[in-house]
């Protein structure tokens, strides 16, 4: 470790004198314009040349430098050079004096801090890892009265100045670009690669890293951001930066740094607040001041810590402050506090406090948005007390101006203190005037509003209408003024909606009118939205007409079939409707049709119902429909015709898949007649199959001569479901003559299609399952079939 002596010129920064390597330099007496530099070489314990450190800071002009330093009553006299004792060590200071403590080490993480460069200046490169801090010492107070030292070892000024920026301070601050702090660590330390800044420019800022003399150096290694306690996060300059502390990792460097730390008894700061703008009058860029424990902080948590971002730049208005306001004044004179400082209680306005010149409101906290204050509190009462004591009671003379950020008064002063107090309730949200009536929880910031509200409970209406002949009274003058406009036919509140010329005497009526407009628009949108799907409406109407026609079709039918008609017409819609196999057939048959023996074979045990496929089930639909529905329209001979033929039109393919024996047919136009009844089993197939596959096949005509009553009866009792014949028989009721079974799949091309006149119409546009025209067409073929037998 060696010291270098530099001489500071009158109008420039102290220049670095050529350093002589080696240790054991004797004490050097520094003059008024001198500064010394302490450096630790990183290679070994005492050998090596001093490292080339970062370039020195540019010093502002003399006038600006005079404005930078803190003022006291003694500063207005002739400035003298002297020495002040800080924790046992002497330091020389003057207007231009500066103490630079440069700690450099090789492999350890380092901080390039304390730089205030103009906008556009690139960061310094090509320097070894160093950690440098510029410590600013104030002018010592030589008064015989003892001064109370702060925690960090600095001496306070004799008199504090309260600073308030003019309204244009934001524009002045925005003209400068802050240079964030930077920390760099070698890759061997295991830190993220994005912390290597010299190759990337300015990317990731780092917080202040403090070294405390009575703490071991090994505890101050680089720590991940996620593992820092909440208290440490609150003390990292309150600037939202990743709290990464840097310290020495070399034992030799640690042994050299410790004597320096203990000799000065002050906290050596490794990083400076880098989010500050270039130095302007009244702004030194120091870290925030912590409240000093003592009688002045008797209010406890109310004296919360001040943010550095709240110190405004620009031409400042200065007023003397009392002892209480010392807690809220910016403190530029002292060193920043040690990094871990557990002995000081953390103020409630610290955790999660938002940044910004005006002090942004944080969720769950009450923030003060006075122009030079960013204190925050947990409770609203604390904020109200803070505003009154710190910002209103401290004002002198007749100046009662609200400096709340964003206030609509725009710094227009009040002529009385109580008016400013009442006005501040608008910003703080305080409503001390509460309604005393039971069940009413309303509160008001102004007493006048509470009085008007109480009249709603008491019924008092002291404001009478002044129009002759009108006896109306009102509880407040504003309602009376609205009412009187009706007598004068004055309607200043007009509807702004295009096409509407309505006008009203009061704004409440206009608001109701605008709501009516919005309700009408919503109704129109709803109608347009519902009318955008006409197909759904057509389908619902079709289904409702189908049920209505079916319910009016069987007034003359008897039995339980008429009771369950609606369920059997649409078995797919009513899935729970399952009836016996021939219940409807036996129930809706006319008594004059004496065919007990012919319907006996149709009574299949219900236990075999699970063997039925959807196709024979639909086939049985027509077994009972022919004689029952058409009995009024055909002769007794036709009604007592031969029993139905065995089911046909089901052929087995070699793969075992069943196909219909009749190909798809063209369709006839739809009819408006009611559809016939389906079978008691209900339709188990698809709706599309019924509409498109209801053919009439010629295969029955080929088998008509061989059909006989006896053979059919005997065959019905002993038929084999798997017998090899032209028609695959299944254990289902026999089909009626002249009808074809339904098919789910397309018909094979084995049989020739029937002519158009022999086909049953069933178009996709038909609403019913079986249009009446289909039965009229089938009846024309029934006589030719029965007359041959």
UniProtKB/Swiss-Prot annotation:
InterPro entries: GLI-like, Znf-C2H2_ZIC1-5/GLI1-3-like, Znf_C2H2_sf, Znf_C2H2_type. Pfam families: zf-C2H2, zf-C2H2_15. PROSITE patterns: ZINC_FINGER_C2H2_1, ZINC_FINGER_C2H2_2. GO terms for biological process: fat cell differentiation; negative regulation of cell fate commitment; negative regulation of transcription by RNA polymerase II; osteoblast differentiation; positive regulation of DNA-templated transcription; positive regulation of transcription by RNA polymerase II; regulation of transcription by RNA polymerase II. It comes from Mus musculus. Residues 648-658 have a biased composition (Low complexity). Belongs to the GLI C2H2-type zinc-finger protein family. A zinc finger (C2H2-type) spans 366-391, 400-427, 433-457, 463-487, 493-517. It is found in: Nucleus. This is Zinc finger protein GLIS1. Keywords: Activator, Differentiation, DNA-binding, Metal-binding, Nucleus, Repeat, Repressor, Transcription, Transcription regulation, Zinc, Zinc-finger. Residues 1-29, 53-93, 278-304, 506-529, 573-684 are annotated as: Disordered. Residues 80-92 have a biased composition (Polar residues). Disruption phenotype: No visible phenotype. One of its GO terms (cellular component) is nucleus.
